[in-house]
């Protein structure tokens, strides 16, 4: 329904697209370019996410297809915490993946961290910020911990208690000061469900490196066409009214009902024209 429509931004993420093999990534990105006009695209982002999923071959594929922004998300640069929350990548792998992306070149690199992780206090956050400052990303997203019910972290908290979560005004301040030292300014913030404490997620960026998609999705002033299990297509009408069309979250069920999902979304998009 939206083939050859004008696009402002393309964002592939929400999970970790770089878990795909290089050939699969190549096929996905080639299909996008074959079916949509990229002539007006101002921003093309792929979440590289976990450092252990990043290889030079995958980065070369992203660059070949014109991806200009990637996100490498350590969450913390403390190895023990990474093990505790079920992250396979080590701090060293994060540094290696970042250096590899810089060597390939052509990418704006964002990094995500999470404040309020179990047993992490001010010293741990300071260490993470210092490690990130040494790498010099173009932007930084500071998340306050949101606890997902089915996660390894959720089970750990059930056993050890919420008092292990130590996000405070001071840890938020440490992150903000670190971003400022990198020449970044805050440009968007949002809250989400199940967050620990009365905090928010804040995006920081150096001048001119702000994420267009992040701004558009927060302001809810532009239609977003989403594809994939758990994705939500959002239609913004001229009168400001917003309607949503959700795909089922379960991957197996999504595959089983793919024809139904496509037909439903086609009808939704056609109705919104």
Task: Give residue spans per PLM region.
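Conserved non-cysteine loop/helix-boundary elements of the Radical SAM core domain that shape
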Residues: 1-175
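Short, glycine-/Ser/Thr-/acidic-enriched flexible segments
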Residues: 17, 194, 230-233
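Alpha-helical structural motif
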Residues: 28, 171, 192, 247-254
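A short acidic (Asp/Glu
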Residues: 121-122, 199, 237
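A C-terminal junction/extension of Radical SAM enzymes
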Residues: 150-227
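Radical SAM enzyme core and accessory elements
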Residues: 203-273
């Amino acid at each position: 329904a939206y083939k050859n429509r004008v696009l402002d931004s393309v964002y592939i993420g929400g999970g970790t697209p770089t878990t795909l093999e290089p050939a699969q990534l190549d096929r996905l990105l080639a299909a996008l370019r074959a079916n949509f006009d990229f002539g007006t695209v101002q921003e093309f982002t792929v979440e590289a996410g976990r450092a252990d999923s990043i290889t030079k071959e995958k980065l070369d594929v992203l660059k070949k297809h014109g991806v200009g922004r990637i996100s490498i998300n350590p969450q913390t640069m403390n190895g023990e915490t990474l093990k505790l929350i079920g992250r396979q990548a080590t701090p060293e792998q994060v540094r290696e993946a970042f250096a590899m992306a810089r060597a390939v070149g052509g990418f704006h690199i964002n990094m995500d961290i999470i404040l309020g992780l179990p047993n992490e206090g001010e010293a741990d956050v300071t260490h993470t910020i210092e490690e990130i400052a040494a790498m010099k990303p173009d932007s930084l997203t500071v998340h306050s911990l949101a606890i997902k019910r089915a996660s390894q972290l959720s089970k750990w908290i059930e056993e050890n208690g919420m008092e292990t979560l130590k996000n405070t005004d001071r840890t938020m301040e440490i992150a903000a000061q670190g971003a400022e030292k990198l020449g970044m300014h805050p440009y968007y913030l949002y809250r989400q469900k199940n967050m620990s404490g009365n905090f928010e997620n804040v995006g920081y960026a150096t001048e001119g490196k702000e994420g267009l998609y992040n701004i558009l999705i927060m302001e809810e002033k532009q239609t977003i066409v989403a594809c994939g299990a758990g994705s939500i297509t959002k239609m913004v009408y001229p009168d400001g009214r917003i309607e949503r069309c959700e795909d089922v979250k379960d991957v197996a069920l999504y595959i089983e009902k793919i024809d139904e999902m496509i037909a439903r979304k086609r009808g939704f998009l056609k109705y919104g024209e």
